[in-house]
Amino acid sequence: MTLKAGLEIHQQLNSGKLFCNCGLSENGKDVQFKRKLHATSSELGDVDIAAKTEQIKLFTYYNKSCNCLVYTDEEPPRGPNADAVKIALQFAQLVNAKIVEEIHFMRKVVVDGSNTSGFQRTGLIATGGIIEYDGKILELDQLCLEEDSCRHGEEDHEYLLDRLGVPLLEITTKPQLDDSKDVQKAAKAIGRLLRACNVKRGLGTIRQDVNVSVNNGQRVELKGFQDLASMPKVVENEVKRQSRLYQMKEGKIGQPINVDNCFKKKREFSLALKIENWNGILGNKDSPEGHVRMGRELADYAKRAGLKGIMHSDELPAYGIDNEETENIKLSLGCNDNDAFILIFGKEKITKNAMEIIVERINTKGVPKEVRKVTPKNLTRYLRPMPGASRMYPETDIAPFKIANLKVRKPKTLDEREKDLPLNDEESKQLVNNELDKQFNILNKKFDLPKLLSRILLHTLPQLKNEGETISDSDLEKVLILFQKGVIVKEGIPKALVQSSRNEEIQVNSDNVEDELEDFIVSLVSDKREFIKEKGMGAVGALMGPVMSKFRGKMDGGDINKVLMEKVKEIL
């Protein structure tokens, strides 16, 4: 089977929210309100299939931590945020994409509770462009600026508004990847290029989706990758799953029938469906990856309709249904030994809706066009139907945004920033990866101490932070000034930083510290004369310990070692 894959990257931008004046970390008052969302039709009057599926559940959505009226959908949106637009344009420049003259925002229907308005706003920024990875080129399809969704709360119906409205840059590539490892490499290259711009960092700030198809079949969108390391394995397993779906027998189905009279005890409304020649397919566990187990697949479809799951002939009798009841169902459906059946229970309306969805899925040949979520075992499970063009319609509350009014400078890439640093490759890479190169350049321009500054930023400050100390930029500059004046030595910088941060007096070197050092070493080597004669110059290492314990931070370690070696030689 031939793989064809493309990427969709969603990166949070480090600006204010997209259509209000709220900051990204602002939570506001703890306000609770409820909404029941309904799917709206597109310009052509069609309702998107994905929106229809969400609407079947008839949830009442609950949001809290409300931070402004725009994102409670109580007042019109403002904006868009100019800083967010600039960041998006910077990335467009980096990939040589063709930037649009005006941004026209659209509404994308979303009724799963993740947006209070029932839609997500998105605007096209640029088209085309390329990403280079591992000596290869991947073409981009388009770049869009959109608003992020709510976070899930503790309950399924509960959502938190702190993330709603955070600007997202959506990067969509063309389906040109034909190797699972290339999918990972391309995603990594895009992520690295994004970090040249002012984007958010940390867990959950970037999300990667992968579109996968085999043999030019239907596109399946994979969501929820935990990390880039799992990407090749997930894609490989998805290719196997789709390949097996193409090889699977076609299931011929009968009419769903009510089988309430097949049970000894009264149960909820029940429907059963016969599937010819599917015996063993619903509960198949033969493949090592667990694909394709159609019973689980159909159960996931039923859950989206509001049921808790399904039962099927490959696992019955079980779950309170005995052998006699199982045989009654088979008899009612007219099943033979090669046939299978599906059984569902629930409220009549929900059960009928669920059965319609199950029937539609069974009748779909090969691979259905759908969205699937990635599991911790690097497999995928059905999430929802693939949205279509019917979910889009124009945003009437936001005027077109003219890009010509913005002056945007193309940022340097991470590689370019590394080359600009007067350090070795490893130190330069660490500073850039930790977003410390800007601070380094500012300090180095003032003090011209590249090696020392690299050591302080990469090692000293993180170590002090781990010890619970908070060192400000002013503390660091104050100590560096004292170092350049020669009143503290390199080894004394960590202690001086702590003293400055605690508003304590910084202990500087005394004028006679060299005399004190010489007196101390003379006394020490006199006491250890026999030890020195026995060990020779090898005694220096052992004697450095007590000397450094007294003079660490007062004098340079190299100078201390030099004096000690001279005194040891005199003994020898």
Q: Model segments located where?
A:
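Conserved, charge-rich beta-strand/loop surface module that forms ligand/interface-binding patches
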Residues: 103-105, 114-183, 377-385, 402, ...
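A short, sequence-level motif marking secondary-structure junctions
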Residues: 25-26, 143-147, 223-229
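Charged, compositionally biased, marginally structured helical/coil segments
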Residues: 4-7, 13, 30, 76, ...
